């Protein structure tokens, strides 16, 4: 199976993530205070996860296209993760594997692309600029590099506003699985201009 350098392709849009270190923020916020012990304890518990996986539904909506897929995400910090996108029939549309020495993406034709920067690769392959570094943390319900966020009445992340270059990303959380320890999101939405990305996590497995 050939290995190709990254080039522009019409591929299924991908909302994948990269692991990045988390830090305590001094944000602009409303609602529950981000310096509260409850929020600080929650962040610490999330950051202490040694392994997790989740599966669910992914949707990308813009003025020009609508795409949906099932996804499976498996992460073993600090830099090993796998993201698999499949169509409704269960066939692979796109697979991303990341390790400390690089990133490999396989498309639905079996072609492989290798590189070092997953965020750059996804932008080149799909034509979409997605904040992958921060999405890795947003999917877990922590704010990443964002300094503007709000908490709900349970001291869980409710909204995030993040500026990346000339793009403003707004993230909103619709629901959490509070039976998990720590509680983790089950539905969130990212909006940037006319782009809208929806993620629904049907289940989580954490260690």
From Swiss-Prot:
Alphabetical UniProt keywords: Cell outer membrane, Chaperone, Lipoprotein, Membrane, Palmitate, Protein transport, Signal, Transport
A Pfam family it matches: LolB
Compartments reported by the entry: Cell outer membrane
Signal peptide boundaries: 1-21
S-diacylglycerol cysteine lipid attachment residues: 22
Superkingdom of the source species: Bacteria
Lipid-acceptor residues (N-palmitoyl cysteine): 22
Membrane topology according to the record: Lipid-anchor
Coiled coil: none
Disulfide bond sites: none
One cellular component (GO) term of this entry: cell outer membrane
A GO BP annotation: protein transport
InterPro entries: LolA/LolB/LppX, OM_lipoprot_LolB
Gene3D superfamilies: Lipoprotein localisation LolA/LolB/LppX
Assigned protein family: Belongs to the LolB family.
Function, as annotated: Plays a critical role in the incorporation of lipoproteins in the outer membrane after they are released by the LolA protein.
HAMAP family listed in its UniProt record: LolB
Subunit note: Monomer.
Designated name of the protein: Outer-membrane lipoprotein LolB
Gene source species: Pectobacterium carotovorum subsp. carotovorum (strain PC1)
């Amino acid at each position: 199976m050939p290995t190709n350098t990254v080039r522009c392709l019409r591929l299924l849009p991908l909302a994948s993530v990269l692991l990045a270190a988390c830090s305590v923020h001094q944000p602009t916020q409303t609602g529950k205070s981000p310096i509260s012990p409850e929020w600080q304890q929650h962040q610490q518990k999330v950051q202490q996860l040694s392994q997790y996986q989740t599966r669910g539904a992914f949707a990308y909506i813009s003025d020009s296209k609508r795409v949906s897929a099932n996804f499976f995400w498996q992460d073993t910090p600090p830099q090993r993760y796998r993201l698999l996108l499949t169509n409704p029939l269960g066939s692979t549309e796109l697979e991303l594997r990341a390790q400390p020495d690089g990133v490999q993406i396989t498309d639905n034709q079996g072609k492989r692309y290798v590189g070092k920067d997953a965020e750059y690769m996804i932008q080149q392959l799909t034509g979409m600029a997605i904040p992958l570094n921060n999405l890795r943390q947003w999917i877990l319900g922590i704010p990443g590099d964002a300094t503007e966020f709000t908490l709900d009445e349970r001291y869980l992340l409710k909204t995030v506003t993040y500026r990346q270059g000339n793009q403003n990303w707004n993230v909103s959380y619709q629901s959490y699985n509070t039976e998990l320890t720590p509680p983790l999101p089950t539905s969130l939405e990212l909006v940037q201009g006319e782009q809208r990305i929806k993620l629904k996590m049907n289940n989580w497995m954490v260690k």
